[in-house]
Amino acid sequence: MPIISIILPVYNAGKYLRKCLDSLKVQTFPDIEILCVDDGSQDGSRRICEEYMLADKRFKLLSQPNSGPAAARNLGLRNAAGRYLMFCDADDWYQPDICEKLLKAITASQTDIAICGCRVIDEGEQVRPQEDIAYYRLYYSGKQQITGELIQRTNVMLWNKIFKADLVRQYGIDFPTGYEYDDNCFYWQYMCVAKTVCFLNEELYNYLRRNDSVMGKVYNRKNKGVYDSLYSLEYFYDFLRRNSLEKRHQRLFVDIYQNCWRFCTGFLDERQYAQAYKIFNRFRRILPPDVSSELKKHCCPRYLLRLGNFKLAEFICLNGKDGLTGCRLIDIRLVLFSKLTLFNLSLKNAVVRLKFCGLRILRLRQRK
């Protein structure tokens, strides 16, 4: 039985795959298995995996019709034999001693998870300095008790972490399929059942940031997955309830939800408003009243107007039910007022022109 199982989803990664597999093959800690999960590749990636499997028995090949990275990782979880779990993306690569050092960190510190640093590399092979990429920076060092603040200040990426397989199986931790940002949900689930963590401030993982990667598309308004974090929150809350953890982690859930909602409201497409609003209402109904009221203010048109999201504020005013928006008349007036824009102001001639919904409605001129 291997000590570490490394799960590697593979989909049309032929351009990068050999570099990734070579980095796994030369690990200084040899007692590993590499589960290459082919997600219906069409570019010869499967043949590359087969080549490595024939040359090194530690490589294993699993296959599925194209179903996305979450389903591929779940297939890897079901077939992993190791005591510890690690993940890698097919366009990234490990430093030669990442397995050895993370294993030593988690065992020596007797913690439930160990986390290392990473190097972020643009596709042109330019290494980005850590100060330019605050999200990936480690804000802790050594052994730490896991708190809500620590969970939120630590990046959710899977590839710079080592997990205990027993904890994953005990609590049924897995990935929500069909959505992007599935690694968020796995991370939240695991950290809610783990008690301690060890941080290793060494850059042992090389993350290639591509323009067409999930993270590269985060700030693209046309990306349909930009609000998938809301769906992953649904999955996360179901996990908490299934394991009777919702009360213990109520504060954490609310904080994560507010952060996700604040992020998503700036990027939602008008066609996505109804579904996002539906998810919001579901949480509002199942959470305790005090928590629900806290979430409620983040869907209030007044709050959304402050964020500059006029269209979503308008949508909620027109579709809000059950008193969600508080004093509906006030909110509607605020939304209408937000559409009242200063068209032209000339101090020299003392002329003011106003527009409403693009139509000029008022022109004032001071008498001489």
Regions found by a protein language model. Name each.
Residues 23, 30, 38-47, 67, ...:
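A conserved acidic beta->alpha catalytic loop
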Residues 31-40, 60-65, 90:
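Short beta-strand/loop segment that forms part of the nucleotide-sugar
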Residues 270-368:
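Membrane-interface aromatic/basic loop that binds lipid-linked glycans or pyrophosphate carriers
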Residues 64-80:
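Glycine-rich, basic loop-to-helix element that forms the pyrophosphate-binding segment
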Residues 85:
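Short aromatic/hydrophobic "clamp" motif used to bind/position activated sugar donors
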Residues 69, 90-224:
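Donor-binding/catalytic cores of nucleotide-activated saccharide
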Residues 12-26:
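Short, well-formed alpha-helical segments that are part of the catalytic scaffolds
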Residues 2-5, 23, 33, 185:
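Cell-envelope/extracellular polymer assembly enzymes that use nucleotide-activated donors
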